[in-house]
Amino acid sequence: MSDEQNFSRIQREEVEGAPPVASGAALRQRRLTETVTLNRYLYRQSQHLEHMLLDAVELQSLLEVLLVSLPRHFSFRVAELWLYDPDKDLARIIVGGERYGHYLQLHQDAFAMQELYGLEPDIEWIDATDSRMFEVLKSEYGISSALMLPLLESGRLVGSLHLGTEEKNFILGDEEEDLLAHLAAMISCCFKLAVTRQQVSQLIMLDPLTQVGNL
C-alpha cells in the first residue's frame, strides 16, 4: 500500500472516530448554560460580599473588606482605594491606614479621580492600551487590566475602587454590569455610614470644653 493510501486511510479513521460536530442550537444551549452557571456563581459571591459589607460596621473593618477580602473573594490580584478627602477629615478618623500603603490613597483634590471617569461616572473596565492604567495600580507588575468602581454620594464622586487582574480579555455582560453597579452603590452607602459612625464615636470621646480625648 502506498504512503498516499495510508495517509488517506488514517485521515478517514480520524474523521470517523471524531466526536460529532455540535449543531448551532447545541452550541447556543451550551453557552446559555455556561452563562447561567456563571451568573449564579457571581450572584452567590455578591450575596456573600454584601453580608461582609453589612457586618463591617467600623470604618477599619470596612477598609479591610474592600482592600483585602473583596479582591480575594472575586479572584482579583489586588485592590486599590482612592478617597476624596478635601478637609483631611478622613485622615483624622482612619486608624491604622498606613498598613495598606499606597493601596489606600486620600486625595485633597478630586481632579485625579474625575479624570478616570466621564461626566457621569460609571463602571469602567480598562486594559493595558488605556492611558488610565498608568494612573491606577501603578506600582503593580503583571496587571493586564483593571475594574474601576466609582463611589458616589448624591451623584458626587467621593471615591474610586480599582481591582487589578492578570486577565487580558474580560467581557462584562449587562447582568454583570448591573451586579457591579449594585455593589458599587452598596459600598458607597456602607462607607458613608461607617464614616459617620466613626466621627460620632470620636466626638463622644472628646471633652466638650478642651476638645481633647477623654481616653
Give the residues covered by each predicted segment.
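Short hydrophobic beta-strand micro-motif common in sensory/regulatory domains
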Residues: 144-154
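Short regulatory/linker helices and ligand/cofactor-binding micro-motifs at input modules
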Residues: 32-33, 44-60
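Regulatory sensory and allosteric helical modules in signal-transduction proteins
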Residues: 98-139
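Short, low-complexity N-terminal regulatory "tails/caps" that precede and couple sensory modules
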Residues: 1-41
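Signal-transmission/dimerization alpha-helices at domain junctions
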Residues: 28, 154-160, 179-198
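Conserved nucleotide-binding and Mg2+-coordinating catalytic segments in signaling enzymes
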Residues: 202-215
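Helix-loop-beta substructure at the N-terminus of cytosolic sensory domains
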Residues: 55-102
